[in-house]
Amino acid sequence: MTAVFGLSLATAGPAAAAESGTWVAYGNTNPITSSSSTWGCAGSQTLATDVLAQVCAIRAANNTGTQSAVIVRNNRSTAYSVHTYADLFTSNGGNQGAWQCATKALAANGWTVCFGRTITLSKVISVNSVGSANGVRLGTSPYV
């Protein structure tokens, strides 16, 4: 996922001064296992029948680039519309920003990720993320 760093994040939550995130479609390629970055993700939550989402914090392989992401897996045979929101926090409680991805019809039978902007932080500062999708709370990711 290192190639994705620098893109904006996707999230779905309270209306704050959130930046726009960036949707990236992966088809049937799992975005976590296909990445050289470290992903810390909360458990999957059901948005609708055959549609799951989870919030993640990501740290680049170089240990300095961090970002928030919301992964959506659409197992339906038709497109499904989703909007997301996520915040990225440091282990000392600092909010590094909020991102939202506008409603988009996500392709059938595939993975799509909303990424927030890459934030450069020292590798000694851990980050985690909270988020939502279509108003469903996705919980809190582990620290990475």
What label would you give each PLM region?
Residues 1-17:
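Secretory targeting and sorting signals
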